[in-house]
C-alpha cells in the first residue's frame, strides 16, 4: 500500500477486512501529508501531538522500516523520546526527524541502538553519542541540517559508518573543522561555515557540492591536497558566493600538479571575474580538467564575461557543453 498515512487510515471504514490494514504499514510518514492545512495543524496541536503519535504506534502491528516525523515550524514539538525508543526496538531502517525548536532537540541514547539504520536524516537536533557507541555499521546515507555536534564527534560518527555512500551537511553548529574518513563515500554535499575541511580516505568520492560561507587557502599545497584526496571526482559544484581576500589568490596555482582526469561536469556559481581569487580559482580548475564535457558557470555581471567564455573554449579542446549565466542582469547564454 502506497497511500499517505492519512488516506490509508481512512480506508478502515470501507469494510471489516480493511479496518486494520493501515496498522501494518511498514512506512509511517507523519509529515504534511498528515497535517494537511494550517487549520489541521491547529486541531492536532489542541489534541496533543504526543497522544496522537502514541495512539498510532499503539495500534500499529508488524515491523516499521521507515519513519518520518516532520513538524511545521510554528508547532511545539511533542515528547518523542519514547517514540525513538519504540523505533529502536523495531529494526528501523530509514529515520527522518525534522524538529522545529529554538533550542536543538537532544537525541536520546536509544537512537544510537538503531543498528539496522540505512538512512538517517536529522534537522535541529543535538547529537552526543554515548561513549560505548560503535557507529552505524549499515548506514549508507546521512543528512544533518542545523544540527549541533562537535567537530570531534562528527568525525568519529562518520568514520564509524563504514558503508556510508551519501553525506549531506548543512549549517552545522559548534563545528569549526570537519574530517571526513569514509572509504565508501560517493556523494558529498556541504553548505555552511567552516574553517577547515579534510577529506581522508575518500577514493571513491565522485560527486561533490561545496557551498562554503567562508573559504581560506593559505598555500598552494592546501588546494592541491584537497583535490588529490578525491581522484575519482566526476561532478563538482563549487559556490564562490563568499568573499575571499585577493591576497589568497597567490596560493592558487596555474594548474593543479595532478590533473582531474575523471572530472566531466563542473559547475561554478557566483563568480566575480574582476575578483582575482575567483578568476584564478576558476581557470585553475578548468586548466586542470582535460576531460571536461559539461561546464555551468554563473558569473556576477561583469565586463569580462565574453572574454572569459572565449578563453574557456580555447582551453577546452574537446567536445564541450557550456551553460553560462550572468546573474545580475539575468542574461543567459547556452553553447553546445
Where are these regions (language model features)?
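Conserved hydrophobic beta-strand positions in leucine-rich repeat
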Residues: 28-32, 65-70, 93-98, 118-123, ...
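Hydrophobic, well-ordered secondary-structure elements that form the walls
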Residues: 285, 330, 336
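Leucine-rich repeat
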Residues: 1-165, 170, 189, ...
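Plant-skewed but cross-kingdom recognition/interaction modules and surfaces
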Residues: 125-126, 134-202, 224-227, 273-278, ...
